[in-house]
Structures are given as C-alpha cells and as structure tokens.
Amino acid sequence: MTAHDDPAAVLTRLLHAIDALHWPGVRDCLADRVETDYTELFGGEVHRGSGDELVAAWQALLPGFDATQHITGPVLAKPDSDDLLLSTHVRAFHRLAGAEGGELWGVHGHYQARLTRIDGDWRISELALRMFYQEGNTGLPELAGKRAASSPRAPRPEIA
C-alpha cells in the first residue's frame, strides 16, 4: 500500500514533506488545482491556484524558519460524492533562533482537506485551517519570509 492508497497518509505525508522542505514530496500530494484557506490565520481571501503555485508560496516562507513541525491527531475521513473529506487536529510549531520578540510561533487548530482521486491516487484538492489559537511570536512569518529569500535553511532527508 502506498501513501496515495491511504487517504490519511496523504495528509501526513504532505506535512512531513513540508517540515523536511522536500518540495517534490509536497507537490506529489497535491492535485493540479488546489484551494487553500488560511483566512482564519492570515486574513485575506481563499486562494485558488495550481499545486505548483502553492509549493512556490510555501518555498518563499518555510525555509526561513530554522525548523517547523506539524503534529496531527487521528485523521477522520468522510465520503463526499467521489471525494473524501478529512479532518484532524493540528499543532504547528515554527522556530527562528534569536528572533526579536521570541523564537517560537505556534499555530493550533483543525485541518480540513478534500481529497480527490486522480489517476487512481488520492490528492489534496482543498486544504483549510480552522484556527483555535496562536501563541508566541506572531511576527515570525514576516521574518522567515525575509530570511527565506536571503539565507534559507537546507532541506532535511526525505522521510519514508
């Protein structure tokens, strides 16, 4: 059984690849068109774009942190027509050593994802974060974005 056979593993694999900065692994979990909703965290609008655009957006931010770690709870799945709706708790930790205002930023909430079968494999076609709360230095994303452009951290080895 591959990660694309097990819907819950697709979401877990995505988050592991994000934390490792393994961009081919991230892209492999996504549909060609993806809707992302981080409005409860960052404001703005729901984004609809390509999987490649989403990877590029994450590449412009996440390598600026010294480390990220996304921890999820059990993943619940519910059929919705030909798709599956997944939900899980998430605690996302972000670290940037020596940052003014504190080196940790935590985002805690619930991920909701829609998985669509594409050529027999499950892919994420929608991803939304439903916020519970944040803690720590909420200015870290801005600092990490600047650092990602100038001195990004190196990827970690891919996790199976």
Language-model-detected regions and their locations in the chain:
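Short, low-complexity N-terminal intrinsically disordered segments enriched in polar/charged residues
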Residues: 1-32
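Aromatic-acidic/polar surface patches that form glycan- and anion
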Residues: 3, 7, 19, 47, ...
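Generic signal for short, ordered secondary-structure residues
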Residues: 4-5, 56, 94
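Poly-acidic low-complexity segments
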Residues: 22-25, 37, 129, 137
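A solvent-exposed, acidic/Ser-Thr-rich amphipathic alpha-helical stretch
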Residues: 25-91
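A beta-strand edge to alpha-helix "cap/lid" segment located at domain peripheries
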Residues: 63-160
